[in-house]
Regions:
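Amphipathic alpha-helical segments that form the core helices of the histone-fold
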Residues: 40-51, 68-69
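Hydrophobic alpha-helical membrane-embedded segments
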Residues: 143-180, 279-287
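A composition-biased, non-transmembrane "mature-region" signal
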Residues: 2-39, 50, 54-61
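Cytosolic/matrix-facing juxtamembrane and C-terminal tails of multi-pass cellular membrane proteins
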Residues: 263-271, 283-311
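Juxtamembrane inter-helical linkers in multi-pass membrane proteins
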Residues: 173-200, 252, 301-311
């Protein structure tokens, strides 16, 4: 990472190189969400390098000066991104639930929170995504290692590592949509001004690439656990709630669980107890989903966002 050098800043406060501009912008966004910082840096570098390529006769310093009025100085851009982020999050965020004072309100109020169902669906979806991610990484690593000694293996390895960045962005969008955690909306910028070999080398030494692959490998066991817990808890709770009603309506005569039978002519006093246990288990399942969603969002944020670059 390029260190900020005050001597490369013009008297007017504008940096003279694109890396210095990005470093200034990064420092201006200190304390902001790492995902927001990644998006801001990507947009700024994309814009500045596009302007530089369209004006080959200008230096980086001249380009920065020429776009200062339209795009803005680093401090101005940082303020714009902070303000925009507040507005966007306010528009996208679900209405905050009314504060609940009693423990019963906290316990049963989870059913009215949209994030509960987002986390629930994510836990169900994670089995499919976990299988896909795990298969993709294992296959990609195996083929990359096997083909690396061949000429055709080099472009395959590059393509595979590039696909990891794309899948990381896709998973981030899923996490933000379902779990509510702010994730990057832009990929990591691949500098077009660097030599090809250096850009290829950065793919292999980028710790976030390896962290993303590790995350994808984790997703298979996590997906199995998530899916199993949700399906089991929902099935048992809904069965306990619905079976007494079904028995009363004539749908069957007995519910058997191991050696325990809940039947029409058996012990009808157990019916309300079974329904109560089913309702409680259902709400416990919703709380588990909320907790798992919160923890998994933190895991995804830590492993998929290049936060170390912005500390």
């Amino acid at each position: 990472m390029t260190a900020f050098n005050p001597s490369s800043v013009r008297p007017g406060g504008l940096p003279t190189t694109i890396p210095e501009y990005l470093e200034h912008l990064r420092r201006s966004l200190a304390g902001a969400d790492p995902a927001l910082v990644q998006d801001a840096l990507y947009d700024a570098e994309e814009y500045l390098r596009s302007e530089l390529s369209e004006n080959p006769g200008k230096s980086e310093a001249d380009v920065i000066v020429s776009v200062a009025g339209s795009y803005g100085a680093p401090d101005e851009v940082a303020d714009i991104y902070r303000d925009t982020e507040v507005k966007v999050q306010s528009a996208l965020r679900a209405p905050a639930p009314k504060p609940r004072r009693s423990w019963m309100g906290h316990f049963f109020g989870v059913i009215a929170e949209p994030r509960t169902y987002g986390a629930l669906f994510y836990m169900l979806l994670s089995l499919a995504t976990g299988i896909f991610y795990f298969t993709w990484v294992v296959t990609g690593i195996s083929l990359s290692a096997g083909l690396a000694v061949l000429i055709i293996g080099v472009p395959f390895v590059i393509l595979y590592f590039g696909s990891i960045r794309v899948l990381s962005l896709v998973e981030g969008r899923i996490v933000e949509t379902m779990l509510g955690e702010r994730m990057p909306r832009r990929p990591l910028y691949s500098s077009r001004g660097q030599p090809l070999l250096k850009r290829i080398g950065e793919l292999f030494i980028d710790p976030r690439i390896w962290a993303t692959q590790l995350y994808f490998l984790f997703m298979l066991p996590l997906g199995i656990v998530y899916f199993t817990v949700v399906v089991t808890c929902l099935t048992v709770s809904l069965a306990l709630i619905g079976t007494p009603v079904g028995l009363l309506l004539g749908f069957g005569s007995t519910l058997s669980i191991d050696d325990w039978n809940l039947g029409i002519n058996g012990q009808p006093w157990i019916w309300p107890i079974a329904m109560l246990v089913g309702v409680l288990l259902l709400f416990v399942t919703l709380h588990i989903a909320r907790g798992v969603g919160y923890l998994h969002a933190l895991l995804a944020k830590h492993m998929l966002v290049k936060s170390a670059q912005y500390d």
